[in-house]
Amino acid sequence: MKMIIDGKKVDSLSGETFDVINPATGKVIESVPKATAEDIELAVTAAVKGQKEWAKTSVTQRADILHRFVEIVEQNKEMLAQTLCAENGKPITEARAEIGNISIAFPAFAEHAKHFYGTLIPQGTEAGQETTLQLVTREPIGVVACIIPFNFPCDLYDQKVAPALMMGNAAIVLPSSDNPLTLMKLTDNRKLNIAIIIYQISQKSWCTRQLSIHTCCFGNCKVERHCGLWICSRNGNG
């Protein structure tokens, strides 16, 4: 399989790959690209550009796209469940349930975003503002790095990617290198314009450090303790 950067299926610029192993059989399922710092730079650059266009779409348009995404997931849910079972090692019943959660979570975030209103502050609430009506609106952060742990990859994908997209952000998806295949298949959706928004990079610990230089929001800083400490130390040093 290949990574997806700027809506295109690509290999690593280094040409390096690593194997995804079935934990039950010890056999290789698939080989995936091993991302380099240069690959991440390309993904970040494309995400910044794509986010500006994505942010121009209305909340209802974004919701429609996510609902179409769910329809395609439903059409391929058994294939996705079998992939998740093979690469993750969880029983097929649990894999099917986790894939089924996509059709619950994505619509839920899509519909919630439609009612995520701004705030109106009446006149006189603050001293000196007796005649001023203040309106607080919500704006996208920009690019969100969605770091996905190995244990519930699809559930965490739902909880990070769906709200990020619905609020007008771009999302760079960084799956666990133990089991990236299901998320790569989810992201490889050629029928949707969503491909310009989500980017797939095969995860290694240093990828987190590289991304932290650029992105202003992390979906999860607990993927690896030393990476979390590195991010904190960097923030502390300005």
Task: Describe each model-derived feature in a short phrase.
Residues G118-G238:
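Rossmann-like NAD(P) dinucleotide-binding subdomain of oxidoreductase/dehydrogenase enzymes
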